[in-house]
Protein backbone atom coordinates (compact mmCIF):
# COMPACT_ATOMS: atom_id res chain seq x y z
CA UNK A 1 0.00 0.00 0.00
CA UNK A 2 1.28 3.47 -0.90
CA UNK A 3 0.27 7.05 -0.22
CA UNK A 4 1.47 10.16 -2.06
CA UNK A 5 1.27 13.92 -1.57
CA UNK A 6 2.32 15.93 -4.64
CA UNK A 7 3.00 19.67 -4.56
CA UNK A 8 3.51 21.56 -7.84
CA UNK A 9 4.94 25.07 -8.05
CA UNK A 10 4.95 26.64 -11.56
CA UNK A 11 7.34 29.55 -12.14
CA UNK A 12 5.77 30.28 -15.54
CA UNK A 13 4.24 28.38 -18.47
CA UNK A 14 7.29 26.19 -19.06
CA UNK A 15 9.24 25.99 -15.77
CA UNK A 16 8.02 24.23 -12.62
CA UNK A 17 9.09 22.37 -9.50
CA UNK A 18 7.38 19.26 -8.17
CA UNK A 19 7.74 17.83 -4.68
CA UNK A 20 6.41 14.37 -3.88
CA UNK A 21 6.14 12.97 -0.35
CA UNK A 22 5.35 9.30 -0.14
CA UNK A 23 4.96 6.40 2.23
CA UNK A 24 4.74 2.70 1.48
CA UNK A 25 3.87 -0.34 3.56
CA UNK A 26 5.10 -3.54 1.96
CA UNK A 27 4.69 -7.22 2.78
CA UNK A 28 7.24 -9.74 1.53
CA UNK A 29 5.90 -13.28 1.18
CA UNK A 30 8.37 -16.15 0.75
CA UNK A 31 7.32 -18.60 -1.94
CA UNK A 32 6.36 -22.01 -0.55
CA UNK A 33 8.83 -24.06 -2.59
CA UNK A 34 9.66 -26.61 0.11
CA UNK A 35 9.11 -27.32 3.83
CA UNK A 36 11.71 -24.75 4.90
CA UNK A 37 10.27 -21.87 2.88
CA UNK A 38 6.76 -22.87 3.91
CA UNK A 39 7.64 -22.19 7.55
CA UNK A 40 9.34 -18.84 6.95
CA UNK A 41 7.22 -15.92 8.19
CA UNK A 42 6.20 -12.96 6.07
CA UNK A 43 8.16 -9.74 6.60
CA UNK A 44 6.65 -6.26 6.70
CA UNK A 45 8.40 -2.94 6.23
CA UNK A 46 7.48 0.73 6.21
CA UNK A 47 9.26 3.09 3.81
CA UNK A 48 9.19 6.88 3.62
CA UNK A 49 10.50 8.96 0.74
CA UNK A 50 10.72 12.31 -0.98
CA UNK A 51 11.20 13.21 -4.65
CA UNK A 52 12.14 16.61 -6.07
CA UNK A 53 11.79 17.33 -9.79
CA UNK A 54 12.57 20.31 -12.00
CA UNK A 55 10.42 20.34 -15.15
CA UNK A 56 10.88 22.33 -18.35
CA UNK A 57 8.21 21.80 -21.02
CA UNK A 58 7.87 24.03 -24.08
CA UNK A 59 6.34 21.31 -26.27
CA UNK A 60 3.35 21.78 -28.56
CA UNK A 61 1.19 18.87 -29.65
CA UNK A 62 0.81 18.48 -33.43
CA UNK A 63 -1.11 15.20 -33.48
CA UNK A 64 -1.08 11.84 -31.72
CA UNK A 65 2.56 10.91 -31.01
CA UNK A 66 3.72 14.03 -32.89
CA UNK A 67 4.96 17.18 -31.14
CA UNK A 68 7.61 19.87 -31.37
CA UNK A 69 9.61 21.67 -28.71
CA UNK A 70 11.60 20.57 -25.68
CA UNK A 71 10.99 18.59 -22.50
CA UNK A 72 13.53 18.33 -19.68
CA UNK A 73 13.29 16.70 -16.25
CA UNK A 74 15.96 16.70 -13.53
CA UNK A 75 15.15 14.66 -10.45
CA UNK A 76 16.45 13.46 -7.11
CA UNK A 77 14.67 10.84 -5.03
CA UNK A 78 15.43 9.56 -1.53
CA UNK A 79 13.83 6.62 0.30
CA UNK A 80 14.46 5.45 3.85
CA UNK A 81 13.08 2.43 5.65
CA UNK A 82 11.33 3.76 8.74
CA UNK A 83 12.76 1.17 11.11
CA UNK A 84 15.87 0.69 13.21
CA UNK A 85 18.05 -0.37 10.29
CA UNK A 86 19.68 2.08 7.88
CA UNK A 87 18.47 0.77 4.52
CA UNK A 88 18.15 3.72 2.17
CA UNK A 89 18.29 4.70 -1.48
CA UNK A 90 19.21 7.91 -3.33
CA UNK A 91 18.43 8.15 -7.06
CA UNK A 92 19.66 10.96 -9.33
CA UNK A 93 18.88 11.38 -13.01
CA UNK A 94 17.68 13.40 -15.96
CA UNK A 95 15.51 12.95 -19.05
CA UNK A 96 15.82 15.44 -21.94
CA UNK A 97 13.75 15.33 -25.13
CA UNK A 98 13.63 17.53 -28.23
CA UNK A 99 11.41 17.23 -31.28
CA UNK A 100 11.90 19.17 -34.51
CA UNK A 101 9.12 19.82 -37.02
CA UNK A 102 10.54 19.04 -40.47
CA UNK A 103 7.66 19.23 -42.95
CA UNK A 104 3.98 19.55 -42.13
CA UNK A 105 3.56 17.16 -39.18
CA UNK A 106 6.67 15.06 -39.90
CA UNK A 107 9.08 15.32 -36.96
CA UNK A 108 12.49 14.16 -35.79
CA UNK A 109 12.68 13.47 -32.04
CA UNK A 110 15.73 12.79 -29.87
CA UNK A 111 15.94 11.70 -26.24
CA UNK A 112 18.87 11.53 -23.84
CA UNK A 113 18.43 10.00 -20.39
CA UNK A 114 20.68 8.82 -17.58
CA UNK A 115 20.34 7.83 -13.96
CA UNK A 116 22.37 6.40 -11.10
CA UNK A 117 21.75 5.46 -7.48
CA UNK A 118 23.61 4.93 -4.22
CA UNK A 119 22.67 3.59 -0.82
CA UNK A 120 22.30 0.33 1.07
CA UNK A 121 19.13 -0.72 -0.80
CA UNK A 122 20.05 -0.39 -4.47
CA UNK A 123 18.02 -0.06 -7.65
CA UNK A 124 18.97 -2.24 -10.64
CA UNK A 125 18.27 -1.08 -14.19
CA UNK A 126 17.52 -3.69 -16.87
CA UNK A 127 18.20 -2.30 -20.35
CA UNK A 128 16.44 -3.67 -23.40
CA UNK A 129 13.14 -3.65 -25.26
CA UNK A 130 10.53 -0.88 -25.10
CA UNK A 131 7.95 0.49 -22.67
CA UNK A 132 4.63 -1.39 -22.46
CA UNK A 133 6.03 -4.32 -24.44
CA UNK A 134 3.37 -6.98 -24.94
CA UNK A 135 4.75 -10.49 -24.32
CA UNK A 136 8.09 -9.04 -23.21
CA UNK A 137 11.15 -11.29 -23.24
CA UNK A 138 13.92 -11.28 -20.61
CA UNK A 139 17.50 -12.44 -21.24
CA UNK A 140 18.42 -14.67 -18.30
CA UNK A 141 21.88 -15.47 -19.69
CA UNK A 142 23.20 -12.05 -18.65
CA UNK A 143 24.62 -12.15 -15.12
CA UNK A 144 23.40 -9.71 -12.46
CA UNK A 145 25.90 -8.57 -9.81
CA UNK A 146 24.82 -10.42 -6.67
CA UNK A 147 27.18 -8.43 -4.44
CA UNK A 148 24.73 -5.51 -4.51
CA UNK A 149 21.81 -5.47 -2.10
CA UNK A 150 19.06 -4.76 -4.62
CA UNK A 151 15.71 -3.67 -3.24
CA UNK A 152 14.15 -2.37 -6.47
CA UNK A 153 14.29 -2.97 -10.19
CA UNK A 154 13.18 -1.00 -13.24
CA UNK A 155 13.58 -0.93 -17.01
CA UNK A 156 15.92 1.32 -19.01
CA UNK A 157 14.28 1.78 -22.42
CA UNK A 158 14.31 2.09 -25.40
CA UNK A 159 16.86 -0.44 -26.62
CA UNK A 160 15.10 -2.07 -29.54
CA UNK A 161 16.59 -5.19 -31.07
CA UNK A 162 17.37 -6.84 -27.71
CA UNK A 163 15.49 -8.57 -24.95
CA UNK A 164 15.31 -6.97 -21.54
CA UNK A 165 18.59 -7.31 -19.60
CA UNK A 166 21.05 -7.03 -22.49
CA UNK A 167 22.81 -4.73 -19.99
CA UNK A 168 22.12 -4.16 -16.29
CA UNK A 169 23.53 -2.24 -13.35
CA UNK A 170 23.09 0.60 -10.89
CA UNK A 171 23.55 3.27 -13.58
CA UNK A 172 22.43 3.70 -17.17
CA UNK A 173 22.81 6.15 -20.05
CA UNK A 174 20.73 6.15 -23.22
CA UNK A 175 20.35 8.12 -26.46
CA UNK A 176 17.49 7.56 -28.94
CA UNK A 177 16.40 9.19 -32.18
CA UNK A 178 13.22 8.75 -34.23
CA UNK A 179 12.00 10.08 -37.57
CA UNK A 180 8.19 10.07 -37.38
CA UNK A 181 6.40 10.23 -40.73
CA UNK A 182 2.57 10.52 -40.79
CA UNK A 183 2.52 9.26 -44.36
CA UNK A 184 -1.26 9.37 -44.91
CA UNK A 185 -1.38 13.04 -43.91
CA UNK A 186 1.63 13.78 -46.13
CA UNK A 187 0.16 12.01 -49.17
CA UNK A 188 -3.24 13.66 -48.73
CA UNK A 189 -1.70 17.06 -47.98
CA UNK A 190 -3.98 17.50 -44.97
CA UNK A 191 -5.65 15.57 -42.16
CA UNK A 192 -8.29 13.17 -43.46
CA UNK A 193 -11.63 12.51 -41.78
CA UNK A 194 -10.74 9.15 -40.20
CA UNK A 195 -8.49 9.02 -37.13
CA UNK A 196 -7.30 5.51 -38.01
CA UNK A 197 -5.62 6.83 -41.18
CA UNK A 198 -4.52 10.14 -39.65
CA UNK A 199 -2.67 8.30 -36.89
CA UNK A 200 -0.70 6.04 -39.23
CA UNK A 201 3.00 6.79 -38.87
CA UNK A 202 6.17 5.25 -40.22
CA UNK A 203 8.99 5.44 -37.67
CA UNK A 204 12.69 5.07 -38.43
CA UNK A 205 14.66 4.80 -35.20
CA UNK A 206 18.03 4.20 -33.59
CA UNK A 207 19.13 3.64 -29.98
CA UNK A 208 22.50 3.49 -28.23
CA UNK A 209 23.29 3.11 -24.54
CA UNK A 210 24.47 0.96 -21.66
CA UNK A 211 23.82 0.05 -18.04
CA UNK A 212 26.64 -0.76 -15.65
CA UNK A 213 27.93 -1.24 -12.11
CA UNK A 214 30.95 0.71 -10.93
CA UNK A 215 32.01 4.29 -11.53
CA UNK A 216 32.03 4.09 -15.35
CA UNK A 217 30.99 1.47 -17.94
CA UNK A 218 34.68 0.64 -18.40
CA UNK A 219 35.44 0.12 -14.69
CA UNK A 220 36.93 -3.25 -13.79
CA UNK A 221 34.18 -3.84 -11.23
CA UNK A 222 31.50 -3.66 -13.92
CA UNK A 223 29.86 -7.09 -13.64
CA UNK A 224 29.50 -7.21 -17.43
CA UNK A 225 33.12 -8.34 -17.73
CA UNK A 226 32.76 -11.29 -15.32
CA UNK A 227 31.16 -14.67 -15.95
CA UNK A 228 30.81 -17.59 -13.52
CA UNK A 229 30.59 -21.17 -14.74
CA UNK A 230 29.37 -24.03 -12.54
CA UNK A 231 29.57 -27.49 -14.05
CA UNK A 232 29.59 -30.30 -11.52
CA UNK A 233 32.81 -30.07 -9.48
CA UNK A 234 34.15 -27.26 -11.69
CA UNK A 235 33.63 -23.66 -10.59
CA UNK A 236 35.29 -21.04 -12.77
CA UNK A 237 35.33 -17.27 -13.11
CA UNK A 238 36.01 -15.85 -16.56
CA UNK A 239 37.04 -12.30 -17.38
CA UNK A 240 35.95 -11.27 -20.86
CA UNK A 241 36.38 -8.30 -23.17
CA UNK A 242 33.20 -6.78 -24.55
CA UNK A 243 32.05 -3.29 -25.48
CA UNK A 244 29.66 -2.08 -22.76
CA UNK A 245 27.65 -0.01 -25.23
CA UNK A 246 24.96 -1.61 -27.38
CA UNK A 247 22.69 -0.17 -30.03
CA UNK A 248 19.65 -0.90 -32.10
CA UNK A 249 18.01 0.34 -35.28
CA UNK A 250 14.94 -0.44 -37.32
CA UNK A 251 11.54 0.75 -38.45
CA UNK A 252 8.04 0.69 -37.09
CA UNK A 253 4.38 1.46 -37.71
CA UNK A 254 2.08 3.44 -35.41
CA UNK A 255 -1.71 3.36 -35.64
CA UNK A 256 -4.56 4.30 -33.29
CA UNK A 257 -7.44 1.85 -32.83
CA UNK A 258 -10.32 2.56 -30.41
CA UNK A 259 -8.23 5.24 -28.71
CA UNK A 260 -5.19 3.00 -28.18
CA UNK A 261 -1.96 3.72 -30.04
CA UNK A 262 -0.45 0.44 -31.23
CA UNK A 263 3.28 0.25 -31.94
CA UNK A 264 4.74 -2.36 -34.28
CA UNK A 265 8.54 -2.37 -34.51
CA UNK A 266 11.12 -4.52 -36.25
CA UNK A 267 14.65 -3.94 -34.99
CA UNK A 268 18.19 -5.24 -35.19
CA UNK A 269 20.51 -5.10 -32.20
CA UNK A 270 24.18 -4.14 -32.48
CA UNK A 271 26.78 -5.46 -30.00
CA UNK A 272 30.56 -5.15 -30.37
CA UNK A 273 29.90 -3.26 -33.64
CA UNK A 274 28.19 -6.34 -35.11
CA UNK A 275 24.53 -7.12 -35.70
CA UNK A 276 23.67 -9.51 -32.87
CA UNK A 277 20.94 -11.40 -34.75
CA UNK A 278 20.54 -10.89 -38.49
CA UNK A 279 16.95 -12.13 -38.26
CA UNK A 280 16.06 -9.12 -36.15
CA UNK A 281 13.30 -8.90 -33.56
CA UNK A 282 9.61 -7.98 -33.71
CA UNK A 283 8.17 -5.90 -30.87
CA UNK A 284 4.50 -5.09 -30.26
CA UNK A 285 3.71 -2.46 -27.64
CA UNK A 286 1.11 0.10 -26.57
CA UNK A 287 1.19 3.84 -25.98
CA UNK A 288 3.00 6.82 -27.43
CA UNK A 289 6.72 7.06 -28.06
CA UNK A 290 8.91 9.37 -26.00
Question: Model-predicted segments: where are they?
Answer:
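A short, hydrophobic secondary-structure junction motif
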Residues: 2-7, 77-82, 200-216, 247-258, ...
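Hydrophobic, well-ordered secondary-structure elements that form the walls
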Residues: 7, 96, 112, 177, ...
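Extended amphipathic secondary-structure runs
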Residues: 11, 169-186, 248-253, 259-265
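A cross-taxa feature marking solvent-exposed loop/turn segments within ectodomains of secreted
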Residues: 14, 103-105, 259
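C-terminal outer-membrane beta-barrel translocator/porin domains of Gram-negative envelope proteins
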Residues: 38-205, 212-215, 219-235, 239
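Short coil/turn motifs at secondary-structure junctions
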Residues: 182, 209, 269-271
